Amino acid sequence: GTRLEGMKASHPFVGQGYDHDVPFLPGDHVAVDTGTGLVHTAPSHGIEDYDLGRRYQLEVPETVLDDGTYASWVPLFAGDHVFKVDDKIIALLSDSNALAAKEKIVHSYPHSWRSKAPLIYRTTPQWFISLEANCLRHQALDAIEGVHWYPSQSKNRIKGMVENRPDWCISRQRAWGVPLTIFVHKETKQPLIDASVNQRIIEAVRKEGAEAWYKNPERFLGHDHDPADYEPINDILDVWFDSGSTQKFVLEKRPELEFPASLYLEGSDQHRGWFMSSLLLGCGTKNQAPYKAVVTHGFTVDEQGRKMSKSQGNVVAPDKIAETLGIEILRLWVVSCDYSDDLRIGPEILKHQEDIYRRFRNTLRYLLGALHGFTSEEHPSLEDMPSLERWVLHRLHQLDTLFKECTQAYNFQAFYSALHHFCSADLSAFYFDVRKDVVYCDSAQDIKRRATRTVFDLLLNHLLHWLAPVLCFTVEEAWLARFGEDRESIHLNFLPETPEAWKNEALAQDFDVLRAQRRVITGALEVARSQGLIKSSLQAHVTVFDPQQKMLPKVDYAELAITSSLDISIEALPSTAFISSDFDHLGVQVSVASGHKCERCWRVLKEVGNHPIHSTLCDRCVHVIDEVT
């Protein structure tokens, strides 16, 4: 095929109006293993042919009219219908001795998806916005750099589209739409550019609507132009031009709104749609993008990642979820998803969201119960709080920082995933468990209990505000339960303050170590429980062997591990000790605690039975009972 490149052939109908030579052109769309490897090229009737014709500067004539017939200037076939002229062409080829063979074959052909009728591609005169004139493409690429794109990779996507897109064809031949409102000179084919004409069109459209253009458009020409010289164009605007114009009639027409918009939000397919048209119109009219930030999301699919379809029976309807599970489960699912990809939904996924919701709700319910009767008079100073409470405040500071960062970046999944982990691992499985004894058994005036309830109050306040955008009704219910019907809605409140003094990285590092050590101890307790040595951790006495002296000083490990007593030994690890791979320098032995069980706090202590009146209580519980009686 390459040997033919540059050669020319005579047209088979030479002398009959086709006296031009036909060039041989190399085309990447032609396959050597299909057919002859030689195909007819018509730049007016195919995308690949058009591109090839543009590359080699071939003419692109309008040969076929709207009714499917050849134009009057086409030799031999003027007025013939493109689908009814085959026999005539074959006869002319035969008469010209240019027909090598004829045969009916079956091959793929473009067709209408609705009517199933065959189709042809054809070029027609259209109106375009040039991306090169006035440097529109360059302006758009510069504007992209000044926009915040979420997710960040969407910036490269729209940037590549702007770099490679052709000029924007803004005209359409449809019966309904916004008219182009252009007059073209019949001889020169140039559009009429006259400010007074445009102003008359604007005033008419403002009064009569877009239909004004179709009601005697010659009236807009005024006295300066002869209607006989001009033809009104009845094409309509590309609907993407309409959508891209929303910046004009939504933002600029409303004084309470600002331009550019804070955010444009749509599906990922709108990079070449609404986002693109808005960008080009913004740059073309205002020299800037019409938005400060753009968020794009994927599409909802079923649990297997398949597109939803009624025929497949895999449609998950939001209203059905709202009726059966409640709208908050649906909202929680939304913030739990990575919306930069397609969002999967189905029964198992929603069941997981129910579990997450239940964790949040149970956390709020526990805090509400523990805060019964709490007032601000219980507040101790930060310096007087135990290290455990100060660690929780540090975690609140971390989460508050994360909340603000994630909401600014529209990364809701990262925050609410972290918040669920906080409620599950930090609160329920650790802090609440450790402080249950303090809340239920310590004196109301004890500094540790006051500090605990103060932190509970701060926890509840922050959790409610963080969850308010998602669990709107649950949070309002908890808010009213805490403060009563007289308090204004939480949704009218600002976020609570998070003092910088709560931040304590050194303490956080200590608690990373403490919790790892605690996991070794609780691992040993689980083994003892499974062996039947104890039934609960409060029945245990624990000895921790720490020959490398890694255990932290001034820490009540018995309290953290929820045991009745705990000793630390620096002796070598005995062979019978429980050893964890996480801390292989620690060994733990569990034995049954000595003493009697306090019937109030359930700790097993030797002091139980020593008091003459309260013989079933430990010293701490005796003191509390005496205080309230």
What are the language-model segments listed below?
Residues 119, 192, 605-608, 622-625:
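Cys/His-rich microdomains that often coordinate metals
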Residues 109, 182, 595-598, 615:
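Residues immediately within or flanking Cys/His clusters that coordinate Zn2+
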Residues 607-616:
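Short linker/helix segments within small regulatory modules
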Residues 6-8, 17, 33-194, 212, ...:
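Residue patterns forming the tRNA-binding/recognition surfaces of aminoacyl-tRNA synthetases
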Residues 184, 230, 374-405, 432-524, ...:
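Acidic, turn-prone loop/beta-hairpin segments
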Residues 173, 227, 602-605, 619-622:
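Cys/His-coordinated zinc-binding microdomains
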Residues 56-68, 174-176, 184-187, 195, ...:
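Alpha-helical recognition segments enriched in aromatics with Gly/Pro capping
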Residues 112, 185, 221-226, 598, ...:
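Short cysteine-rich clusters marking metal-coordination/redox-active sites
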